[in-house]
Amino acid sequence: MMTLATLTLVPALAALAPNVTDLGVPQSGAHSTEISVLTYNIRGLPWPLASGRAKALKAIGAELATMRRDGRQPDVVLIQEGFRGEVGDLVKASGYRYWARGPSRSERVSGMGPENGRRYATVRYPSFGEGWGKFTSAGLHVLSDAPITDVEDTPYRYCAGLDCLANKGVMLARLALPGAPGEIDIVNTHLNSRRAAKVPIARSLRAHNLQTEELMTFINAHRDVDRPLLVGGDFNVRDAPDRYDYRSAERPYQVVSEFCNRAANPCEGQALDNPAARPWLRSQDLQAFASAGPVTVRPIRIETLFGVSKSGSRLSDHDGYLVRYRLSWDPAVVAAASPRPPVELRPQLRRGLGVKVIWRR
């Protein structure tokens, strides 16, 4: 749930206007607006796992500030591996008004896990981090100029190898977009690594599959199906079809790189490729989307940021993955949509039996 610990309004930046483009009313009578989302694993690992990262994180913040001055900053930034305290410096420099953080180091899983996870031994390779406890948070952050009105998050129950040292999980941030009817749900996540976990591939694959089930369960439990949904993060699926394909038919979203590779769905910045080549498996990072209500969403442009500089250096071992989406709606359809109760009650089991009251906008 949203707390002062998970959601921060940066006071010095409160006067800045949210950067969401309103495209007005096309001749067709439909309305539309656009939103850009950057997902970026910033490699904010603590020493001795990585060196020189404080300087790199500050440089990322400075680059986001430059993009803001030029009027080309992403509307939303999804950060993974934001473990270090210098992430606060990055956020301050970048100029985003709202900052939400995912599962903390001490946060624990609530509710029931996947049925087929009962036989998964939580500690099998203690020499590689399993059973040591959590040394860091999930490292997940959401930065936004549009107001964040609610936050939900949970750690993953299952992990493998060195990944178990971080409290990896998933978070959902609900945003109120100016110029759009209602709100939008945005999910950020980081799933178990493959070889970097330092345990057998079969072990890390099993943990990844169970986390995939947990991710889908979380989304289905917390998203509002009447609102557009955007998903991003480090899925750790590069060259790993056994990870990407697991329960793919049950996903409550479409993967952007797969959607845009169809001739019927052209997206600027992504050339069509042979589907047999499965170009969506060339990156660890994915974005995805879904819409079932009166406001539809689809990707329209793909871009890579924070790649190799002219000097040959990189600020992270990942590129930034930027997707621009278009949200469209017919005002008459929105007005005719069935009214919903002004109050929603959700059970809360994390700290004992309780109820969360949500006042709908």
What are these model-derived regions, one by one?
Residues 80, 93, 115, 134-151, ...:
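Conserved beta strand-loop-helix elements of the APE1-like EEP
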Residues 17-25, 217-230, 235-360:
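Metal-dependent phosphoester-hydrolase catalytic domains
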Residues 36-42, 60-88, 143, 173, ...:
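Active-site beta-strand/loop signature of hydrolases that rely on acidic residues for catalysis
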Residues 191-215, 239-250:
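Active-site-proximal segments of metal-dependent phosphoesterases and phosphodiesterases across multiple
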Residues 2-94, 103-127, 132, 137, ...:
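N-terminal, active-site-proximal structural segment of metallo-dependent hydrolase catalytic domains
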Residues 45-49, 153-163, 191-206:
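Surface-exposed cleft-lining segments at the edges of enzyme active sites
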Residues 98, 119-126, 132, 147-152, ...:
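Short helix-loop capping/hinge motifs at secondary-structure junctions, enriched
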Residues 24-38, 140-154, 165-192, 325-330:
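Beta-strand-turn-beta hairpins that frame and shape the catalytic cleft
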